[in-house]
Amino acid sequence: ATIIEAPPSTKNAKKSRDPEMHQTKKGNEWHFGMKAHIGVDASSGLVHSVVGTAANESDVSQAHALLHGHEEDAFGDAGYTGVEKRDEMQGKGAKWHVALKRSKIKAMRDGAIKDLLIEAERTKAQIRARVEHPFHVIKNLFGHRKVRYKGLAKNTAQLFSLFGLANLVLARRQLLASPESIPS
């Protein structure tokens, strides 16, 4: 998930912020806005599901909405810790591979087991990195760093179209390289 900022200003007719947006702390910094949660195919890197929530929603609470139902494996960062124990995940066939918190790895004694665990976490991180590419396209190439509208519904609708266009950007090479795309 990524945070998309909303204007925190109260200089409007109602003298209030958007009531559907909330604030959250990321690292040591506070942000006001919404969160975009996405599900990405590990092999192609294309987005298959999008959920927009207030910024104070946890990542793990939206995990069930990010699955399309045919996954065998699902990868998540440390924000998805405990996802397999949640009620809405019961009966889903996906096996979750969640990143360990850094403090757990640091607390281990140096040795072969720690080195093996670090290598396993590195492999999980390489797969999870595919999720960050659509966020890069949306925020850096399209410049969508702040929400444009009031309310989650309108902003989530815009996220659907932006991630659809991001899929075209990410699949550009495959689309142009396929022989079917060349007119005869």
Regions found by a protein language model. Give the residues of each.
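Polybasic low-complexity intrinsically disordered regions
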Residues: 1-95, 101, 160-166, 174, ...
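Helix-centered, glycine/charged polyanion-binding patches within enzymatic domains
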Residues: 72-73, 78-153, 157
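Acidic, contiguous segments within the catalytic cores of piggyBac-derived transposases
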Residues: 118-119, 124-126, 162, 169, ...
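Generic structural signal for hydrophobic core residues of well-folded globular domains
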Residues: 138-141, 168, 172
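Short alpha-helical "patches" and their helix-cap loops
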Residues: 150-156, 173-184
